[in-house]
Design a protein with these regions (language model features):
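C-terminal domain-boundary segment and adjacent tail
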Residues: 159-168, 209-212, 218, 348-360, ...
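C-terminal motif of bacterial Sec signal peptides marking the signal peptidase cleavage site
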Residues: 26-27
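Extracellular/cell-surface secretome signature
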Residues: 52-160
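N-terminal secretory signal peptides that target proteins for export/translocation
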Residues: 1-11
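Conserved, mostly hydrophobic/aromatic
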Residues: 277, 341, 369, 432, ...
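Short, low-complexity, disordered segments immediately C-terminal to signal peptides
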Residues: 32-50
Length: 536
């Protein structure tokens, strides 16, 4: 008997996105091996009947609405890399890499969230994702569609490449892009040193949430702030910059770093995004691909080994799969950077600039989310949509506190003009970048917070992280992006109250589920026959 569960699942207003969650999974089996003597030729009779392999039930993990596969005693996934790490920490040894775990171990490692530890919810598809992989169990309709597209054994896995999942959802008409797009607003910070700035930004988002306004920041963190001064020689910067050198200093004491890591974890757990701002904040406009690869390797080492390097206890709330985006220090890019971003697992880059009405395109395999070239409201000067550029324009990057209120007003009105033009125009995403610095007596932070409070609660406005924008963009075809760029959609402003209410979706409990031979870190290759001209 089907058990119906209800949960809140965020969809864009006016039914803009349709996801076929009202699906049930049909019976499936583990792969069976038939011995060679029973498969000699088609003309010979098989002299031994192979018993039908067992089927597995899909059981609720917790009260958040996700499932796992079980035979009543053992759990057959889904398992993430983070869960495997926890299992190993608990002394599980080789059992952590088995195709099945005890239900007790599985549920403990899964965590208390809707998605298994180490993954996050993609609100466009409704599936949890770990890096570039979506996590099942998947409904029979999608499994059948995958098989019909010659997906082979990959279709029976509980881990699909997200590109594959998007293509299947589109082909089966289970997901549909909105005719009128939301107005995305992206607010991000570069830096990560100041504990005061971490607390101030996080607390501001909480204050808005109490008012019914959703806002999530993206934090582009610099890895040197997670290396103590005494460990600085661990870093040998690319392009001959020298060992132990940094353009922005270091992380201070181990205690300083412990507190900073706590802020990173809290921000991530509160729904903000953590992304990469490289390591030493050097301008890489002349760096080779090898230089950038070296820099990214240092970033991973200093961030994900931060506790070990600095003699601390604890662990990050996410692993390398959680780092999906990049912004180059000083926006210094080179051809070598764009050749390596996709290879390093990044989904998007925010290091370029473009016109304010630009709809993102993929370049070199990653989404291009550029800052905007905009005109200031009071001084009518051209400036990038980033606080430092206002600071330089206003006072040549030197403090002038006596004019702080005027600078704040100019910045706020400029941001509002940027918003109004896009909101009433083609709704291209807004990109605004700030730093963990209170230049000109905090004028730019004040302007940013005033702006966020003014727009994030408006109808059809989504103040989200960059990875959430990437989730939305992954759903679109080039034709749909071109239509958005032209503004070829109804200019409808929804009612504010209807926009803020979550849509209630009914999900049917799957009776049985697919079980693959591999769990954990299995990686899948997208099925080429499913590309259908969609973006790579």
């Amino acid at each position: 008997m089907l058990i119906r569960l209800k949960f809140n699942f965020k969809l864009w207003h006016q039914g803009l996105i349709y996801c076929g969650l009202l699906l049930s999974l049909s019976a499936c089996t583990t792969a069976s091996t038939v011995s060679p003597q029973h498969t000699e030729t088609q003309t010979k009779t098989i002299d031994k009947i192979v018993e039908a392999p067992p089927t597995f039930e899909a059981k609720l993990v917790n009260d958040k609405g996700k499932y796992y596969c079980s035979d009543g005693q053992k759990a057959f996934g889904p398992v993430t890399q983070k869960m495997i790490e926890k299992c190993l920490d608990w002394g599980g040894g080789s059992a952590c890499n088995q195709t099945h775990w005890s239900e007790t171990l599985f549920l403990k490692a899964y965590g208390n969230g809707r998605c298994p530890d180490g993954s996050r919810l993609n609100s466009i598809t409704g599936y949890c994702v770990e890096g570039q992989n979506a996590i099942g169990p998947f409904p029979q309709q999608l499994v059948t569609a995958c098989s019909n597209a010659d997906g082979g054994n990959s279709c029976k896995s509980q881990r699909w490449n997200t590109r594959l999942l998007y293509n299947l959802l589109r082909n089966e008409e289970l997901i549909k892009a909105p005719e009128t797009p939301p107005q995305f607003v992206l607010l991000a910070f570069d830096g990560s040193s100041s504990l005061e700035a971490w607390n101030k930004s996080r607390n501001f988002a909480k204050t808005l949430e109490q008012k019914g306004i959703n806002l999530r920041f993206t934090y582009f963190i610099s890895a040197v702030y997670f290396v103590s001064n005494e460990n600085r020689k661990l870093y040998d910067a690319p392009a001959g910059k020298g060992r132990g050198r940094s353009a922005i200093g270091w992380g201070g004491s181990a205690d300083d770093i412990q507190k900073r890591l706590e802020q990173v974890n809290l921000a991530y757990q509160e729904g903000h995004e953590i992304a990469s701002h490289a390591v030493g904040h050097f301008n890489g406009n002349n760096w080779s691909e090898a230089d950038w690869k070296k820099e990214f390797e240092y970033f991973d080492k200093f961030i994900f080994d931060a506790y070990k390097i600095n003699g601390l206890t604890g662990r990050l709330a996410f692993d390398r799969n959680g780092i999906e985006g990049f912004r180059a220090p000083e926006l210094g890019t080179s051809p070598g950077l764009f050749r390596t971003l996709e290879k390093q697992g990044f989904r998007y880059d925010t290091s370029r600039s473009n016109q304010p009405n630009y709809w993102p395109q993929k370049q070199n395999g990653v989404w291009n989310f550029p800052l905007a070239s905009i005109t200031t409201a009071l001084t009518k000067k051209s400036v990038l949509s980033m606080d430092y550029n206002f600071y330089y324009l206003h006072s040549k990057a030197k403090s002038n506190s006596s004019q702080a209120k005027r600078y704040e007003e100019d910045t706020f009105k400029t941001y509002m003009n940027y918003f109004e033009n896009n909101y009433k125009g083609n709704r291209a995403p807004l990109h605004i970048g700030h730093h963990f610095s209170a230049w000109n007596n905090g004028a730019y932070w004040n302007a940013l917070f005033r702006f966020a409070e003014a727009v994030c609660g408006q109808p059809d406005v989504q103040c989200v992280t960059y990875r959430e924008l990437a989730d939305f963009m992954d759903m679109l075809t080039p034709t749909q992006i071109a239509a958005y760029q032209k503004g070829s959609f109804p200019k409808v402003i929804a009612d504010k109250n209807s926009q803020t209410n979550p849509v209630e979706v009914e999900e049917i409990k799957p009776e049985l589920c697919q079980v693959s031979e591999q769990i954990g870190t299995q990686k899948l290759t997208p099925i080429s026959s499913l590309n259908n001209g969609f973006l790579d």
